């Protein structure tokens, strides 16, 4: 048998055990026709990222599921990998280059990509090594990267298929533009923040009447791009202005007044300025009324100037403009200013010209980039889009039919809202790091050629000069294919794809249901004909101890690696799931981590005690039933119950409940009761009883370690290997299941009667400050004496009884006696010589007053007809039970006071 150290030190165990697992190949999974597959794909963390609490909870939950299924006999595959994270990684590389005095343009695309790949090589393994520190039992032989050869092949295959079906198109559309990242982002990537702002009330003169039209805007800098103002055609206030024009202040330019439902008669003055190039609603109004589109912002957040206008004019002159191509304004004195600088300057000029009526403060939601948090600019830009309606419909139906379930179910609504309201997906990004769009443009005739590999000639004109689109695809385009691209798709004959796909469970946070979950679902259905998984298990975010979201600005982030270094990975893992509920946010608590560490120490010490009491020739295995005593059958029944309950919890993704159950079983049932109860048998001199106690101790410990293993894998492996008769690793041992032959419910009930009585006696002695060395006789009044009679050794040891008398009805004197009562027995114990009488009387009188107050409260409730008639029956019954217990409690106290004279 392996000898355990006196104290558990995770730093001496965890790395060694993880390397043992890697060396043994225990994480590797292959297709096995004799086993049922169970597959999870890891949500790929950013390749440049570092482990945070979100990763920790996400991967702990996945590891619990995979380790459980592996023990249950499944071919359990957990596919790991990392995401290339276009915007985040490119920003990191650009920042590093800036320190060298370099820009992307200075080194060129190839030079930049060389640096980006070097960055990925240098930092890409950091997050992987951190996931290993957590104990993640992924099949690292299958580790993938969203830009590896297989994933790149899948991306090109999908792009070409969608293009050929007319589901991918390129055009000038309104997009969300980040002027800092200098790229478009999708609707799902826009985060909204409440900010202080203003409504500026402007006055536009009507050409035909000379009157002033009042309108309000939060963005006066866009007015230079106004090409109309809108009124509602049904608004009687402006019926006389149909067909009229206004003079655009500052530019002195005539623009039309159009009638459109976008102008809401109930809001403000009912007049709105229309800037088709810089507002999505205005863009739609512009299309309806065939208004010019005039861009006044550059893509890096400045006002356009003469050079910008000249470039756009040249495009139009050459006939290379496409549908909805915007014209560009030379903003004159404002050219080159940032948008905020221009806002201030324009407001000064409007006020000077008498066009600014008033300024009204307001709070409003402002769209920001999810990566850099810069304010998003709606811009007309030529981008690639995916038509969403044909793809969204099957994805909605799949969830409606129950092919895919969300846990908790309430998150189905989030998914449905996103899918039913989604617009066409802008998939192009003005970045260099990522999957370059597989589209080429003929320099001679302008033909667009979409193909998986570079074409040699233009299919339209035969020209040989073709230039690839410089843009890359949205990161989520490749990660949407993750469940099947990692298993060999588009090779539909792949053995892994046939066996492991569709996957089973996706574990992820609620914040990326729109970003990622929805896109994987429609992608799986569209390209494989199958839903990519059957269950989406949603977890909340980890907040700080005050319930605040962890953020750099608050400085309240917790580094999981620091927690692991201090307490061990098992303690962190257990804290993250113990008591958690699916879908709900959780709070990080150092006290809970300490409690988990203490739990690990308790288990370590309990195992050491068991091992120290085993002879060298010990052979594990349960003895025959006739050799088991009441306590053995009790603990085996409890073990059976917890095994069944935990299996049910894990089947329903209730990991918090399962963790709480094994914690309670090991701490309360096994350590605090069964080990203590076994000690007298181990030291009794009865060899057969001692052997039985040892065998049951080892058997229960073995099963308990296996039940705990998915939650605390390191310590359970170390302790399991120390047990006599253990196999090579706990990881591949069978998961404990319900053993119908171990359901001794009668013995369980009988033993718990004894336990309850012992607890009551010990509580009474503690309250009376009676030292454990002071023992006394006792009389037990009970209708069922058998359990107590067979447990006299436990009564002597744990209730401090010198001798015990049993009676069905006690009729003796009670002077000097203290009573303890349980639902099954009443004890009469002579305590006078063991206590300080005056002090105990004072305590009892205080307890009596408290008990009388409690009893009166319950009586008032039960004497209230309205409560009894209107409250739920279960609540009324609960109050009646509490009332009865309160009566018994008061009677016991009064009897004890009487006994003390």
Segments predicted by a language model, with ranges:
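N-terminal, positively charged nucleic-acid-binding surface of large information/translation enzymes
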Residues: 1-234, 275-288, 292-311, 343, ...
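Active-site-adjacent bridging/hinge elements
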Residues: 34-42, 64, 100-103, 128-135, ...
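Structured ligand/cofactor/substrate-binding pocket environments in proteins
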Residues: 54-66, 73, 82-83, 151-154, ...
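Secondary-structure transition/capping motifs at alpha-helix termini
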Residues: 67-75, 96-109, 129, 133-138, ...
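Short, polar/flexible loop-turn hinges at active-site or ligand-entry regions and domain interfaces
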Residues: 100-114, 335, 405-406, 561, ...
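Short Cys/His-rich metal-coordination motifs, predominantly Zn2+-binding knuckles/fingers
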Residues: 181, 251, 372, 443-445, ...
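Short acidic-hydrophobic surface loop/beta-edge motif
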Residues: 200-207, 244-249, 367-371, 440, ...
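Feature 926 captures the class I aminoacyl-tRNA synthetase adenylation module centered on the KMSKS loop
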Residues: 201, 417-477, 481, 526-569, ...
């Amino acid at each position: 048998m392996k000898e355990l150290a006196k104290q558990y030190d995770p730093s001496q165990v965890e790395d060694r055990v993880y390397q043992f697992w890697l060396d043994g190949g225990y994480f590797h999974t292959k297709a096995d026709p004799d086993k049922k597959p169970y597959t999870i794909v890891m949500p790929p963390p950013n390749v440049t990222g570092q482990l945070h609490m979100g990763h920790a909870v996400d991967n702990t939950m996945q590891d619990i599921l995979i380790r459980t299924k592996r023990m249950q006999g499944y071919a359990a595959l957990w596919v790991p990998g990392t995401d290339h994270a276009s915007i985040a990684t490119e920003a990191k590389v650009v920042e590093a280059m800036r320190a060298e005095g370099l820009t992307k343009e200075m080194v060129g695309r190839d030079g930049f990509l060389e640096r980006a790949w070097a960055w990925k090589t240098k930092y890409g393994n950091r997050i992987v090594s951190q996931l290993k520190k957590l104990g993640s039992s992924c099949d690292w032989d299958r580790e993938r990267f969203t830009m590896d050869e297989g994933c790149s092949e899948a991306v090109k295959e999908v792009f070409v298929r969608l293009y050929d079906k007319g589901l991918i198109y390129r055009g000038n559309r309104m997009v969300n533009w980040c002027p800092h990242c200098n790229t478009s982002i999708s609707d799902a990537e826009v985060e909204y923040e409440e900010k202080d702002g203003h409504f500026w009330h402007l006055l536009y003169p009507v050409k035909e009447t000379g009157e002033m039209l009042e309108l309000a805007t939060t963005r006066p800098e866009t007015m230079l791009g106004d090409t109309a103002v809108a009124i509602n055609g049904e608004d009687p206030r402006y019926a006389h202005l149909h067909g009229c024009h206004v003079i655009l202040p500052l530019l002195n330019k005539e623009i039309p007044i159009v009638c459109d439902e976008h102008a809401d008669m109930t809001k403000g003055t009912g007049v709105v300025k229309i800037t088709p190039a810089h507002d999505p609603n205005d863009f739609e109004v512009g299309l309806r009324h065939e208004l010019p589109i005039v861009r006044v912002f550059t893509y890096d957040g400045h006002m356009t100037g003469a050079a910008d206008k000249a470039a756009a004019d040249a495009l139009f002159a050459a006939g290379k403009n496409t549908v909805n191509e915007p014209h560009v304004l030379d903003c004159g004195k404002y050219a080159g200013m940032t948008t905020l600088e221009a806002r201030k300057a324009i407001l000064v000029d409007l006020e000077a010209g008498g066009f600014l009526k008033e300024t009204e403060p307001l709070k409003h939601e402002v769209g920001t980039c999810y990566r850099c948090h810069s304010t998003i600019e709606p811009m007309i830009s030529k981008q690639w889009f995916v038509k969403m309606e044909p793809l969204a419909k099957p994805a909605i139906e799949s969830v409606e039919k129950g092919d895919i379930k969300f846990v908790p179910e309430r998150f189905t609504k989030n998914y449905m809202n996103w899918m039913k309201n989604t617009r066409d997906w802008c998939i192009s990004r003005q970045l260099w790091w990522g999957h370059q769009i597989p589209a080429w443009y003929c320099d001679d005739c302008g033909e667009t050629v979409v193909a998986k590999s570079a074409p040699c000639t233009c299919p339209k004109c035969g020209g040989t000069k073709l230039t690839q689109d410089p843009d890359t695809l949205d990161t989520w385009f490749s990660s949407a294919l993750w469940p099947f691209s990692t298993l060999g798709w588009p090779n539909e004959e792949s053995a892994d794809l046939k066996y492991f796909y569709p996957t089973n469970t996706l574990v992820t946070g609620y914040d990326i249901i729109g970003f990622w979950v929805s896109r994987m679902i429609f992608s799986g259905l569209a390209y494989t004909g199958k839903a990519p998984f059957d269950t989406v298990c949603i977890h909340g975010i980890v907040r700080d101890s005050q319930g605040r979201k962890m953020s750099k600005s608050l400085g309240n982030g917790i580094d999981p690696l620091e927690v692991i270094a201090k307490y061990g990975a098992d303690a962190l893992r257990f804290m993250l799931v113990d008591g958690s509920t699916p879908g709900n946010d959780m709070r990080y608590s150092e006290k809970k981590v300490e409690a988990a560490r203490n739990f690990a120490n308790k288990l370590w010490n309990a195992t050491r005690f068991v091992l120290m009491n085993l002879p060298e020739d010990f052979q594990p295995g349960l003895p025959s039933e006739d050799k088991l005593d009441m306590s053995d059958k009790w603990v085996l029944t409890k073990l059976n119950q917890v095994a069944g309950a935990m299996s049910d919890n894990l089947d329903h993704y209730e990991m918090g409940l399962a963790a709480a159950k094994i914690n309670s079983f090991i701490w309360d049932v096994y350590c605090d009761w069964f080990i203590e109860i076994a000690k007298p048998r181990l030291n009794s001199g009865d060899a057969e009883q001692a052997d039985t106690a040892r065998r049951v101790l080892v058997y229960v410990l073995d099963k308990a370690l296996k039940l705990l293993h998915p939650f605390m894998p390191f310590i359970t492996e170390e302790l399991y290997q120390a047990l006599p008769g253990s196999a090579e690793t706990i990881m591949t041992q069978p998961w404990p299941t319900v053993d119908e032959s171990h359901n001794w419910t009668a013995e369980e009930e009988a033993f718990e009667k004894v336990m309850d009585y012992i607890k009551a006696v010990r509580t009474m002695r503690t309250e009376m400050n009676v030292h454990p060395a002071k023992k006394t006789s006792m009389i037990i009044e009970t209708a069922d004496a058998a359990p107590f009679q067979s447990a006299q050794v436990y009564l002597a040891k744990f209730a401090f009884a010198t001798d015990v008398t049993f009676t069905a009805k006690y009729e003796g004197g009670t002077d000097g006696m203290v009573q303890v009562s349980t639902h099954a027995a009443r004890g009469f114990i002579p305590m006078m010589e063991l206590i300080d009488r005056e002090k105990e009387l004072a305590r009892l009188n205080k307890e009596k007053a408290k008990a009388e107050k409690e009893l009166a409260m319950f009586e008032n409730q039960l004497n209230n007809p309205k409560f009894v008639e209107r409250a739920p029956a279960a609540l009324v019954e609960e109050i009646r039970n509490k009332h009865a217990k309160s009566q018994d409690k008061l009677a016991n106290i009064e009897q004890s006071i009487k006994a003390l004279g």
